[in-house]
Amino acid sequence: MQQYSGNSYAHKESGMTSQIVLKYPEQPCSPEDMQDLSCPNLFLNREINWLDFNAKVLDEALSPQQPLLEQLKFLAIFYNNLDEFFMVRVANILRQYRNGAANGSADRITPAKQLAEIRRRTLLLTSRAQSHWLKSLAPQLLERGVRIVRYTDLSEKQRRFLDGYFRNEIYPVLTPQAIDPGHPFPTISTTCLNFIIQLRNRDRETRFVRLKCPNNLSRFIFIPRNKEAKTYASLGFDPNVRGDDILLLEDLMAQYLELLFPGHTVVSSALFRITRNTDLEIEEDEADDLLEAVRDLVEQRRFGDVVRLEIAHKASRELVDFLARRLRLQPFQIYRIKGPMGFSEFMTLYNVDRPQLKTPGIQGHISRLFQEGDMFGHLRKRDVVLFHPYDSFKAVLDFIRRSSEDPNVLAIKQTLYRAGNDSPIVRALIEARRRGKQVVAVVELKARFDEERNITWAEELEKEGVNVVYGFIGLKVHAKLCLVVRREAGHITRYVHIGTGNYNASTAKIYTDMGLITSNEDICSDVTDLFNVMTGYADRDLYRKLLVSPQAMRGPLMEMIRREIELHKRYGNGEIIFKCNQLVDAGIIRALYRASMAGVRVRLQVRGICCLRPGLPGISENITVTSIVGRFLEHSRIYWFHANGDDIMYIGSADLMPRNLDHRIEVLAPILDPELRRKIREDILEVHLADNVQTWQLQADATYTRLKPASKETAVNAQERMIAQHITRDDI
């Protein structure tokens, strides 16, 4: 078997490709392990492979082809991804490490080795990110008028004004917290910015103080350059920015630390932030009230174990050691940071009014079908497939809005996972209830990091008389479903929308997702039955058309792979195409290996984590794995089987991970219309698989290679081609 290569992370530009070279450990395998495809070398580690994905995001931030504010956006996304990775995944591995648990995943890499490799790669990635910001991006933004400056760069007039501003507006809000036997070490919130300060009093005694940067003040202070101090009307966000200097709040605070401690000398100080474990679990079986249990969970996150300490790279050894002792950290959990800390907050600056520094936005295709005319009559005749953001998400909003206003609609049932801050879907559901319709909302309270928002929506919907269900005990409801029940010509007709992404108008502009709207009787009956399972005590293991986890998805998917193998043995034309976000499940991976070993052509486009190792002679040589990272987050899930020409296609909410297949309520819906299947395969799948601009290909040695068109080859940027196709698209 081939060996993994590469001893470090490096970004290479050579000829036709960029390459991510990543060291990956090999482990010995027995003949039995190879026979039943359980050899750990056949599986890539999910945590290490996730870092590969975030490296691709960073590559976009470093690309000179990206406009400057797009580089800033990708850099902020890279850091936000990394924060969540430490909060959840690294926290979980750290818990395994401390408990002496073995790695239960197929790659069998121990928690200790994973933590060491995560640290090594994180240091390499963040070093590149920090260097790019300090040496390239920040100076270029400064030249183009987005002036993020240090306090020492300000004019004397600006400093005089800021002196009054600090004393009048910031100083009263600050709360220094002494740390001594009478003042215990304070609870520090995850990812908030703080100063740790070492003081010396008149008796030359040393004291330590923590000072939090107030999170209810803007971190970005916009200071006009060319006005008299008395005309400085506002220091809040200024989208116009052209005449402003932008100073970070922590930089201003650092200039006035002595003011906070009269009678003391500031010996040293450093900015720091911690990351806590937020992957806490609810004992749902013991909870009397799920909403209150989730509310308590959000509160408990304040006290999760500290996973990571980030501290300014010039911090003294005394300050680092003091925090390490108080937070009970080991050296591998400490990261020294050059440049701004908490860079994900810099996404705010993407909103400045500098369109020439951004990629032009797109106007998704808006179908008249959902705005005017006989929408329901059309949907009775044919199914509709939407591909966002190229098809505007307004079509989905209009479908639900018109249903809420239609006097013949009797009921609307809706799942909500991440609805966003200002949800037109929620408003439509409330309007439907006010018009006397039966409205049901299954609100998943356990959607990570959206719990508080979902609690707010659930309470608001309940207050308006909507029947609200708080998810499902023991399972997350991740399915994307809307059911409309309508009286037509004396009988009941149903319509459903089944999506791959959230009912969120904001993320629908930047995620690629698909949606099916149909009146197919079997599909509508399945969705009706599933809502009864989620809202009542109905129990169902099999459905007419839908694949529904946890009972009825893994088995049918495995059976379709086995059937493709059998058909290939008979006809020699077997092919499988999967496009999804994550491929982690060992059972699915082994089934795909067996398909490849039988000669079936397997093409996988996996945007994020992929634990399958392609291109291994005799095992996965018929499998290719690619990943697109571009201006939109690839989020669609499409599963296609050739089936000897009688092809089968499903779209839906489920990725190929144990959590999706076994621990969530997910739905995959068949595309029953042959013409729609053809269009999705030819116009979406094949175009994305042909991309040679934004695509990375996973190699057998666990490296990712960025594809580039050959000298005479046509460049294919799938996302840009989708934009062009939808601009000229005829209405549905």
Regions found by a protein language model. Give the residues of each.
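N-terminal localization/anchoring segments of enzymes in phospholipid and broader phosphate metabolism
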Residues: 2-576, 594, 598, 608-732
